[in-house]
Amino acid sequence: MGSSFGDLFRISTFGESHGGGVGVIVEGCPPRLELDLDEIQAELNRRKPGQSHITTPRKEADQVEILSGLLDGKTTLGTPIAMLVRNKDQRPGDYSDMAVAFRPSHADATYQSKYGIQARSGGGRASARETIGRVAAGAIAKQLLRKAAGTEILAWVKQIHTIEAHGIDPSTVSMNDIEANIVRCPEASVANQMIERIEAIGREGDSCGGVIECVVRQPAVGLGMPVFDKLEADLAKAVMSLPATKGFEIGSGFSGTLLKGSEHNDAFIPGDDGRLHTATNNSGGIQGGISNGEPIVIRVGFKPTATIRKEQQTIDSDGNATTLAAKGRHDPCVLPRAVPMVEAMVALTLADHLLRQQGQCSLW
């Protein structure tokens, strides 16, 4: 329970951080889609640990194995696609202290309370390694959306701790801009400040959080359904299911609460393509829970990494007060590696809604 996502384009992830491997089963992908397997691996490379000095030093190749669902290794059959990444660089001994003391603000205590047992080594299903399956499946969803509607999905780091980038234009930012530095902030001068802040906080044995922004350019019109299956509601659920997420905004977000209706409303204007367009995009590309064809713009807040080397007050499994200074290899800031995770969850949501839209509204 709780390890599957989606309705028609549905994924189920499996595996633990220090188990044999992690992976995903993708169901509902349409047949005859020619997949670029290098693109799937490239997305996993963006997510994998050890890619820079501001991420966890754990070394994993994260090489994907596709076990089923493809003809000649590239063409989807319409049957379940199973993908596996084997764990290689495990150090269970780093978690000996955590076997008896709960990490503050981590899932240790709540998993123990719920199940009466937990995978203490590496955090089990609460580890960010669970997201490998999401990113691999999201890479397939990205290719489906691009072929079906010309949709492009890009995310980047907008804020680290108190340092925020203000000069990024969602309509023009490119993948090259985002990947130009290790923090994945397209505003170069701000990126350098972010890197220095992560380094400084990491040296203290501490961690920091921030905000990732994501844009969907050329989304299909009509995605989403009234009331309980609104597109923004499903996007919020998707990205808020990622580890360490604590906040979600779309369009103007909370700043829109400071405007009057006359200031916030997106005036409709005719477009050269024969479609309705809006003069502004405070709605973030979604109105009434349904995509209007304008860029979808969301922001996701991530808390500081819970596992830190700094000594903290906690309790042990018997309820006694103790302290914990975590060992192991952990990200001082999750955001640089979370960028492809956000893109993946957005892609999976849109792919699912695209199939639902086609199934309901394209019969005649």
Swiss-Prot record:
| GO BP annotations listed | amino acid biosynthetic process; aromatic amino acid family biosynthetic process; chorismate biosynthetic process
Q: Which Pfam families match?
A: Chorismate_synt
EC? 4.2.3.5
Q: Does the keyword NADP apply?
A: yes
Spell out the molecular function terms from Gene Ontology: chorismate synthase activity; FMN binding
Q: Which SUPFAM superfamilies match?
A: Chorismate synthase, AroC
Record's keyword terms, sorted: Amino-acid biosynthesis, Aromatic amino acid biosynthesis, FAD, Flavoprotein, FMN, Lyase, NADP
Cofactor dependency: FMNH2
Entry's CDD domains? Answer: Chorismate_synthase
Top-rank EC class of the record's enzyme: lyase
List ligand-binding residues for FMN: 125-127, 288, 303-307, 329
Pathway it belongs to? Metabolic intermediate biosynthesis; chorismate biosynthesis; chorismate from D-erythrose 4-phosphate and phosphoenolpyruvate: step 7/7
The entry's free-text remark on the cofactor is:
Reduced FMN (FMNH(2)).
* Functional description taken from the UniProt entry: This reaction introduces a second double bond into the aromatic ring system.
Q: Which protein are we looking at?
A: Chorismate synthase
Instruction: Point out the gene that encodes the protein.
Output: aroC
